[in-house]
Amino acid sequence: AFVLTLLVPIQMVGQTWDDHDRSGRYTCRDFGQNYLKTLPEEGNPIIFTHGDNDTFPLWYNLDTEGFRTDTRVCNLSYLQTDWYIDQMKRPAYESPALPISFERKDYQTGTNDYVYVRPENKQVLLKNAKTEAERERVYNSFELNEILNYWIKEYHMIPTDTIWFKLDKDAILRSGMFIPYEYRGATDEETKALMPDRMYISLANKNILMKNEIMMLSLIAGCNWERPLYMSVTVPSEMYLNLGGHFIQEGLAYRITPFNYKKLGYNARDGEGTVVDTEKMYKNLMTFNFGGLDADNLYLDETIRRMCYSHRRIYIQLAGEFIKQNDYNRAKVVLDKIEKEMPASTLPHDIICYSTEMAKMYYMLEDE
C-alpha cells in the first residue's frame, strides 16, 4: 500500500512536470516592464489597465523590482470602489497623488456609483433661458469642470451628451505628444493658432456613466495634458469613454490626446480610430525585453501565449506603418527583432497575431 501511495505523486510529477516548469522564463516580469517602458520618463504618467495580466506584472515591477516607480498604474475595474480611489489620491513611491477633484463623500460606496446622462434636459434648460446671457450660462455649464463639480456632485446627472473644455495649448506643446500635421506651424505661436480651442467628449449612446468613468473625466480635467494619461492596449474598447478617436499608440499603450485623429481622417489600425506615433513606438519597442523566449524547449501556457501574441502583433503593426512611409529599412529591423526575440520554434505563427501580414511584409521587403 505504501508503494502504491508513493507511485501516485511520482506519476503526477512525471506526467505534468513539463507543463508546470517555468524555469528560465521571465516573460511576466519583462512584459510588465514593456508596458511601463511605453510610458514617457517625464511627467509621472498614468496608465489605465483593466484585467489581471495587464495589471499585476506592472505592480510587481513597481513594488518588487523598483522599476519605473515614477509611474502610476490605475486599474479601471477597481476604480469603481471608494477604497481604491482613496489609494489613487495618495502618493506612491515617486508618483504624486492622482488629481481627482472629488472628496470622499462624493465617491463613497452608494454615492455617484453611476449618474444618468439625460441630453433631453439640455433643450429644457435652453428653452427656459430667457436671454442670450442665460443661454450662454447654460452652454457654459456643460464645460467639463462644471459637469464634475456642479451637475454630478449636486444633481447626480449630466444634462447633455456633449462635454467640452478649453485646451491649454502651452501644456499640450510641452507634453511632447504627437501634434497632427494639420496643426503644425513654423513656430509654437503658429501651432497654437492652428489648434482647436476646445476638446469635445461625446457621451452619445450612453445612458449612464459609471463611477470609474466619472473618475476618468476628473483625471482628464486634473492632468490637463501636463501629466500624461495612457490606456493599455488590452483594455476593452467599451471602456474607452468614446475617446478611441483621440488615442495615439506609442507601444503597449495609447496616449490620450485632445485631438480627434479619426475626424481628421488619419488612417486607423482598426475601427477604434487609433493611429501610431511611429517615432516613439519604434524607440520604445526596440528596448523591449522578452524574458528568455528565444530559449529552446521553453514551456508557454495559454495565458503567456496570449501575451506573446499581443507583443508580436504590435511589432507587425509598426512594420506596416513604416512600409506605408516607404521606410523599408526600419520595417525590416522591427520584423527581425520580433522574429529573433520570439522565434517560431518557441511561439508558432498564427493568424490571430498577424503572421500572414508578417509573411507578406517579408516577401515585399525582399523586392525593395
What do these predicted regions represent?
Residues 1-44, 56-368:
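ER/secretory pathway lumenal C-terminal domains and tails of membrane proteins involved
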